[in-house]
Structures are given as C-alpha cells and as structure tokens.
Amino acid sequence: MGLADDKNTILVIDRSTDTQSVALVKDGQIFPRVFAGEDARSGDWPLKVRDFLASRGVAPGELDQIVVGQGPGSFAGIRAALAFAQGLALGSHAEVFGLPSTLALTRDNAKVAVVGDARRDRYWVTLYDGVHTVKDFFLVRKEELGGAVPDGFAVVTPDGHRIDSLLRDHYGPRYAGALTPLAAHLAEVAVGHPDLLRSEPLPVYLQAAVRTS
C-alpha cells in the first residue's frame, strides 16, 4: 500500500476489537498484519508483533513513532496496546501517539457517523467530515439515535455483531454497515494528517460499560 513520501518508520497498533491489527510504515509504504481468533487473544501477541517487525527488517530501536488506536472498544485490548507501545518505546527514541480507532472508519471527502454500543442502553456517536471531527464522542439513548445523526451522514459501526439490526432499523439506507477499524487505515491517517496525532494517549472511555473485555 503506497503513501506519499515519508521518512519516518512508524508502528501502528489497534486492539479495540476482536480483529486486532498492526501496520508498519516504512519507506513510504504501509505493511499490514491482522491477528484474528486465537492469534488476537494469545498471551504471546507482543512476540508476534516483534516477529512481524523482524520480518520487515525493523528492530524496535529503529522505530520513530508508535501510534495506538485509543478506541472506544475493548478495555483490556486498548490498555494492553498502550502498555506494549510504551514498553517498546523505552530505550529508544520512538514517540508514542494515539488516534481514535474510529478514524480508521473515515474516508476522504465523506461525511460519516460512527455509532457504537456503550452498553447500559447507551450508544456512543461521533461525526466526521473526512478525517476531521464535526462532533466528538457523545452518548445517546436508543430513542435518541434517530436525531443524533444529521442528514447527509452515512452511518457505520465497529459493533455490528451487537447493534447491526438496531442501526438498520433506525437509519435505513443511510446505514452503510459494520466496519472493522484496522491499523493500516490508521496508518494512512497518521501519515496524511500528523496534526491529528495525540501525545500522551489514553483510552477513549465514555462510561464503564464501554469496557468490552
């Protein structure tokens, strides 16, 4: 996957869903890797990431940046990804940044509403115009979903296994379906829009019920 020329070597990690992924930005190219099923839940996941870097000829000390998807999503997954990134950065010059995982579901020149299950009969919503935030994360009740998304916005969710039918009922043809936030797409944002990177990243928590694992 090609990019505009970029000299930084960047590792991007997203563990906000059951489909967990990494991507390496090197020499203007994005190299993705997806861990699913047992690979995603395995305790040796950090070793698999190190093996992935080695397969691309990159030592942890050669990384310039590490970017982590901040969620919303799996409490354990996001925390583990941040801890891994901070540990990997120790003893190197790599900087650790964050991006909301929902940015992986945006597209250039498209208005997108990302809706997720916050549990306890609440749903989180965030609105984007391209990669730019129109309205940051906010919580709504089920009966408020219809009015939460303005006309002209397509609706997507990373939580299709839980709320796909609900969103179809509320949004009809505006509902574009379930999408998985992948590190490769976050890498595109990180390189194309470095101004969006967040230093000293923390997980996006909307309420305790967002913790999914």
Residues covered by each model-derived region:
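Oxyanion-binding and handling regions
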Residues: 1-30, 36, 40-44, 97-213
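Generic structural marker for isolated residues within well-ordered, non-membrane alpha-helices
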Residues: 49, 85, 164
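Phosphate/pyrophosphate-binding loops at sites that engage ATP/ADP/AMP, CoA/4′-phosphopantetheine
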Residues: 49-65, 148-153
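A generic, residue-level signal for flexible/boundary positions that often mark functional hotspots
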Residues: 52-53, 69, 93-96, 195, ...
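Phosphate-handling active-site elements
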Residues: 57-61, 90-99
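DPxDG-like acidic metal-binding loop motif
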Residues: 65-95
